[in-house]
Amino acid sequence: DDCLGMFSSCDPDNDKCCEGRKCNRKDKWCKYVL
């Protein structure tokens, strides 16, 4: 199952971003979680 890399478009309600990243609800792309 492929995950979405940094700055990939994503769906906040179905977050498929890679580990350590989270789908940003406002910008709709994967951002690092610090």
Curated annotation (Swiss-Prot):
Distribution of this protein across tissues and organs: Expressed by the venom gland.
Residues in the signal sequence: none
UniProt xrefs under InterPro entries: Huwentoxin-1
Main location: secreted
Record GO terms (molecular function): ion channel inhibitor activity; sodium channel regulator activity; toxin activity
Annotated compartments: Secreted
Keywords of this entry: Amidation, Disulfide bond, Ion channel impairing toxin, Knottin, Neurotoxin, Secreted, Toxin, Voltage-gated sodium channel impairing toxin
Stated role: Spider venom neurotoxin that blocks voltage-gated sodium channels Nav1.3/SCN3A and Nav1.8/SCN10A in human (IC(50)=2 uM and IC(50)=4 uM, respectively) and rat (IC(50)=2 uM and IC(50)=2.5 uM, respectively).
Other comment: Negative results: has no effect on voltage-gated potassium channel human Kv11.1/KCNH2/ERG at 17 uM.
Protein name: Beta-theraphotoxin-Pmu1a
Species the sequence originates in: Pterinochilus murinus
